[in-house]
Structure formats: C-alpha cells, structure tokens
Amino acid sequence: EIAQNLGCLTVAIVTKPFKFEGKKRMDYALVGLDELRKHIDTIVIIPNDRLRDLIDRSTPLNAAFQEVDNVLRIGVQSISDLISVPGLVNLDFADVRTIMEHRGDALIGIGVGFGENRAVEAAKQAVNSPLLETSIVGATDAIINVTGGTNLTLFEVEEAAEVIRQSANTDINTIFGAVINENLNDEVIVTVIATGFDDAREQIGGGLDNSLPQNTSYM
C-alpha cells in the first residue's frame, strides 16, 4: 500500500496453499488475495498443487518446498533481468510499466529450447508451464524477450514471437526485446510477461501443446 501511494509499480508473485492444507487455509488465502489486489498493479499466482508436475514421488518434502521458493525467485528475477541486462534490442522500465501498470492478473513464463526448433520450443514452454494459474489465452499485452548465443537468428526471434501471438488467440500488443549472451551455446531462452486478461480468460489447459518436456522449463 505504501509503495502504491508513492507511485511505484507494484507487482506481487504469490503462491496458493496445497489442497491438503485444508479449506480454511485456502479460504484465508483467497481473502488475502482479494485484499492484496486492491494495493498492487499486477499479480502472478502460482498454485502449490501444480508443483507435483515438476517433481516425482521420491522428492523429499524440504526439496519440494525449495522448488516453490525457486519458482518465486525466478519470477522476480525475470522481471529485473528485463530491465537490467543490456540487449541487442533493449527493454527498459517504461516498457515494463506500460505492460504491468493497473493490469490485474498476469502471466510470467520462461522457457528454454535446444536444437533445430529451439526458439519455438522455448516459446511454447514459456506459455504452457504447469505452474501458471492463468493461461495466456485472452491476453491483450505482452513483453517478449528472446535470449540466445551469437548464433541466434532473426528467423528464430520471429518464430518465438509468432508462437506467443498465436497462443494468446487475440490481436495482442507486444513489446519486444532481444539479448545476445555469448555464454549461451545451443540454447535459446524466451521470457514472456502477459497482461490484460478479461473476465472470460481461460485457465491452464488452453494454449499450445502441453506435452513438451517440462524438465527444461524454468517456470
């Protein structure tokens, strides 16, 4: 609330309780979300139950909770990196504010692709992560950032952007960035922040092919 009153861009990245924690705890969380929405520009919600899609039955409990913390960290870092990491096509804070100010629910996704179709695979992973509560379907605005090595091509950048536009299923307005990272070899990383969802937005299950490997998806 203080940050909002100071005119700061306020973004919340939060989790919802596991179902096994009980209805009362979930009800408290939902009330908290409703109150939080009054004081922020944008919110990204990650249901803890979807964590099971990223771990197996042998994963220790403490490691599972560490994975939740890691997802939250990556979400925050993905926003800060868009602003702070210099790019071939730069994004700045004004771009992030344009997409995220007074926008309500948001999607933040990161995907990594390898090989011949690496850019397409990375883009599909970014919009189809099992941890995201909101599908990109119905988004009206998005930031798309593509990071690759010195061999990143114009065609790959175009392919990644087209996957995201088609997945949104709307005439989506996009702000685009591209980064050349000489430390990357075969991989391409795609980051997408999407906002502007209407009340009829679809929940996860929409979008493109969900059968892509999940072990290389950051979020």
Question: What do these predicted ranges mean?
Answer:
Residues 1-219:
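Tubulin/FtsZ superfamily GTPase core signature
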